[in-house]
Every structure is written in structure tokens, then in C-alpha cells.
Amino acid sequence: GIRESMESELAKLKANPPCELPHIELRRGAGAYICGEESAMIESIEGKRGMPRLRPPFVAQVGVFGRPTLEHNMETLYWIREIIEKRGEWFTSHGRNGRKGLRSFSVSGRVKKPGVHLAPAGITIKELIEEYCDGMADGHEFYGYFPGGASGGILPASMGDIPLDFDTLNEYGCFIGSAAIIVFSDADNARDVAKNAMSFFEHESCGKCTPCRVGTSKAVKLMSKAEWDQPLMNELSKTMMDASICGLGQAASNPMNSVLKYFPDELK
């Protein structure tokens, strides 16, 4: 498994270190979505329930076991090695549409070849599907996509020429996050996939703050109705965004907002 592989490679690294190494310890989490939040991850590492902390203090001041803590995404650590070995010029030589570098895009959904694809930063979803995923699955026509996982919002196929990078989607109310892209087709509808995402957030909410705990539950009920109460949904979304204490609650309404904004035909 992955853990055994990592333990084997760490043993090799310690046996022949390229430099003085810090103490390295592997900790296995229970897989809760909330533990992707920086302070909830620290709570989990400390053996406690994964719940986000109120800030300040920030984890850079008071982190794991009360010590200043620097957190990195694993992909960041991977690219540090590549850039040191191959130099920055190599990394920045990749990219499209004015963006620089490479990204690991995790593509799932209605494509022929789902999986993790290493592609240039700034590639569009249409290019990613055609060049790296061998096109849409047979019998399916591209209809829409989540550009950044369940909370990254939803965009229609007509907006499939937007470069995918860290700040290119902000103006559309979406974000790329960890580049976990979900593609759906004309066999699906945006209402259902958005409701499915909200049900996921309801299940994964840690329950610490009311806007997220109650807001996700209320949103699922509203999204299950034949006719959406758009003014109430907008009010609920604003409350969740403004008052939730961590990114889960703040971003949970993004898919719902996207349907209201980009898929109005489904609400008639």
C-alpha cells in the first residue's frame, strides 16, 4: 500500500541522507474531509477530533502541540525537488495561456480516461478532456464541470475555454483548489450534482459552527424541492460564507450558487 511504500522510501532516505534530515514521522488520519483544513489536521495529528480552531492564534504561531507550524501540500514538496534538480527555467517553460508550470489534474466523471494527469498550468478543461482524457465517454456530450472539487463551484460547457490555474476562476465565483476536476455530461443535470455535493458537505461538516452545521442541512432541503427558493438560498449562502469559521462552510454553497448563476434553464 501507499504507507508501506512511503515507509520503504523513508528508510532508504535515512540510510543515505543527501543532507542533515529533520525528524520525519508518518501519521495516518481517519480520512475525514474536514481534516484537509490546516488547523483541523493539526487537531487530528494530536489525537483529537478533527475540528477547526478559532483564529488567531494562527498555526504559524501556535500549531501542532503548541509549536509554530508550517504546513505544505504534498504536491508542493514534490515540485521543490523537481525544480531544484531541473532548475526554475525548466518548470516555467511549461504552461499555456500565459500561465507557468505544471499541475497534477485529477479528472473524474464522464471521460474515457479518468485519473491524475500531469498537464501544463493554464490548460482549459476542453483541452484537458481531448488531449489527456481521450475525450468524453461514449454516448456522452460535455455539459459542465467542477473545476476544483466539490466546493470549487460548477461551470457550464460554454465556459470550457477558461485557463485552469490558481487565480483564473475567481471572477466566476469558482476556484481550482487541488485541481480535482469532475466532468459531467448531458446525461446529468447541474441541480442533481450540486445537491449531491451539498449532501456530502452536510455529512462531512464537523458540526462545530452553526452556519455550516445547520446551513448545509437547510440547503439540502431547499435543493430537494421541485422549485428552488432563490432569494432564501442567496440569503443562506451569504450567511454561510460570512459566518462559518473554516473553508468548508464558507465554500459549501458554491455549487448551489453556480446553478443559480450559470444553469438558470434548469430552474424553470
Which functions belong to the PLM regions below?
Residues 1-2, 30-31, 149-152, 198, ...:
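Acidic, glycine-rich active-site loops and adjacent beta-strand->loop/helix elements
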Residues 1-3, 8, 24, 137-171:
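Terminal amphipathic helices with adjacent charged low-complexity linkers/tails
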Residues 3-121, 133-136:
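Hydrophobic alpha-helical positions that pack around
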Residues 8-22, 164-268:
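Ferredoxin-type iron-sulfur electron-transfer modules in oxidoreductases and energy-metabolism complexes
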Residues 44-56, 158-175:
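Active-site loop ensemble at the mouth of alpha/beta enzyme cores that anchors a bound cofactor
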Residues 105-108, 143-145, 181:
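Short polybasic amphipathic segments
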Residues 115, 153-156, 192:
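Short acidic/glycine-rich loop or secondary-structure boundary segments that cap or lie
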Residues 123-128:
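Short, structural beta-strand-to-alpha-helix junction motif
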